[in-house]
Regions:
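PRPP-associated nucleotide enzymes
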Residues: 1-224
Length: 224
């Protein structure tokens, strides 16, 4: 990051827009940096869901995401605690905290985080939430890599967008449902157009220009 920041700084830009960086170090090392959050897109997703009669619970995959994104939200939320393999750091599972298990049952969930690569974090989060009785699960990430199609999960080694969740009914039959019902993201790095599995919101110049000079990602200029 240090050398990347030095390269950008050497170009002497008047303003540098950075969308929802994974680390706060970015804003500290890049000169004239304006951090843009993606709250407006999350609000759009919530509006879409509420319009369809869905009032979801917000879920953050870890405590860090909760601290970054929970401020000001007006719906119930919970967060995850990842269980990792000692030595490799590989994710083995996830526990849900901050909400009673019975409050998950039958509810729709919107998972929010900054980036999705192959989707292991979201696979284990969604799997745990489904086991707790969650109904539909949606995912919003600010940045989505093409490798979301490469992750191999479940017995059939399917990717995050196609992997099934199997549930035995009271009659003994097996019900198959998608683990993640839909993904929402921006076109910050996502190379494709929206499809049946993914909705892509466009980042544009007007959006960036309306960010205030304080660098916090708010849009107070729109009110002036």
């Amino acid at each position: 990051m240090k050398y990347f920041a030095e390269m950008i700084n050497s170009l002497n830009f008047d303003r540098v827009f950075v969308v929802d960086p994974h680390s706060s170090v970015v804003a500290a090392t890049i000169k004239n940096c304006n951090v843009i959050n993606t709250n407006i897109f999350v609000s759009n997703v919530l509006d879409m869901l509420i319009h369809d009669g869905i009032t979801p619970i917000m879920f953050f995959p870890d405590e860090g995401a909760m601290k970054r994104y929970s401020k000001g939200i007006k719906i119930p939320y919970a967060f995850g605690v990842k269980k990792r393999e000692w030595g490799t750091g590989r994710i083995l599972g996830l526990d849900v905290m901050g909400i009673k298990p019975e409050d998950i049952k039958g509810r729709d969930i919107l998972i929010r985080d900054d980036i999705c690569s192959k989707g292991g974090t979201f696979y284990y989060a969604a799997k745990k939430l489904k086991e707790m009785g969650a109904r539909n699960i949606y995912l919003f990430v600010s940045h989505c890599e093409k490798s979301i199609y490469d992750g191999q999960f479940g017995d059939d080694k399917m990717n995050l967008l196609t992997v099934d969740y199997e549930k035995k009914s009271i009659f003994g039959t097996t019900q198959h449902r998608k683990l993640i019902d839909h993904v929402f993201t921006t076109d910050s790095i996502y190379p494709f157009k929206s499809d049946e599995n993914v909705t892509v919101f466009a980042m544009n110049v007007d959006y960036a220009e309306n960010v205030c000079d304080c660098g916090c990602g708010c849009h107070c200029k729109e009110d002036k």
